[in-house]
Curated annotation (Swiss-Prot):
Residues 256-333 are annotated as: Head domain (RuvB-H). It comes from Bacillus cereus (strain AH187). This is Holliday junction branch migration complex subunit RuvB. The gene is ruvB. Homohexamer. Forms an RuvA(8)-RuvB(12)-Holliday junction (HJ) complex. HJ DNA is sandwiched between 2 RuvA tetramers; dsDNA enters through RuvA and exits via RuvB. An RuvB hexamer assembles on each DNA strand where it exits the tetramer. Each RuvB hexamer is contacted by two RuvA subunits (via domain III) on 2 adjacent RuvB subunits; this complex drives branch migration. In the full resolvosome a probable DNA-RuvA(4)-RuvB(12)-RuvC(2) complex forms which resolves the HJ. Has 3 domains, the large (RuvB-L) and small ATPase (RuvB-S) domains and the C-terminal head (RuvB-H) domain. The head domain binds DNA, while the ATPase domains jointly bind ATP, ADP or are empty depending on the state of the subunit in the translocation cycle. During a single DNA translocation step the structure of each domain remains the same, but their relative positions change. Mg(2+) binds at residue 67. One of its GO terms (cellular component) is Holliday junction resolvase complex. CDD domains: AAA. ATP binds at residues 21-22, 63, 66-68, 129-131, 172, 182, 219. It catalyses: ATP + H2O = ADP + phosphate + H(+).
Amino acid sequence: MDERLLSGESAYEDADLEYSLRPQTLRQYIGQDKAKHNLEVFIEAAKMREETLDHVLLYGPPGLGKTTLANIIANEMGVNVRTTSGPAIERPGDLAAVLTSLQPGDVLFIDEIHRLHRSIEEVLYPAMEDFCLDIVIGKGPSARSVRLDLPPFTLVGATTRAGALSAPLRDRFGVLSRLEYYTVDQLSEIVERTAEVFEVEIDSLAALEIARRARGTPRIANRLLRRVRDFAQVRGNGTVTMEITQMALELLQVDKLGLDHIDHKLLLGIIEKFRGGPVGLETVSATIGEESHTIEDVYEPYLLQIGFLQRTPRGRIVTPLAYEHFGMEMPKV
């Protein structure tokens, strides 16, 4: 598990907190307006027809609210949600056990659905399309296939890597929603709401400062607030002020754009050793001592989002914006 303070991945300490902070309805849900408005229509239409909602695929960077939306979908439809993950379903029998336990209309939420094994996907296809399950009884020449009917259900899949899904699986989702990074104003609203739950006073400017450094991600915003709250209680009077916030985030090595020491290491490594690029991913991996898939999936998305890094056919290139951020001049060609 990624232990970075600024990781969008869920950490152990996040689980209970996220549950207590989780909105229960689309009306309470902040941000993701496009996805939210579309889901409102699809859910209302399904309820009017007294049908289950089409299968939903939620994709985008970690920490943006995919699990929260899955639970909201179940709440809005008035049904139960069963939660599992791609890595937890190791055999077709594991999936069969989950599917046969569902009640009519239930939501089955599979996180990290891109990590399902292909043999398990093949069991899932008829379940998604025809609400039935084909299982093999016996072994060898006496083995026979039996089809079991399943109650109608809605599969909600979540992934940070939509491109890693097989085309047959992706095509079976009727609703595809990409979750985008949040704006500073949206994150500030989330920070202030979280502070209310914590029963901590926070200045509006402090909430904005945390939001600016949260990399567009609610999970990171809430995590930063927890750490700043610690400083406010120990080094201040308990109120999260702008002064306390800036001091805390500086000590936590989170700069004004939400970059940490690993981001600095990656960008400065390319600048100082490869004159800003282009440089191949594997070379970057060897230079900073991180696995290439971790760089690609965890570190790079935000750097691409803010325009500090470019991916080109020839390799990674650090942009003029990054040089400006570090107070450095770009090398002359």
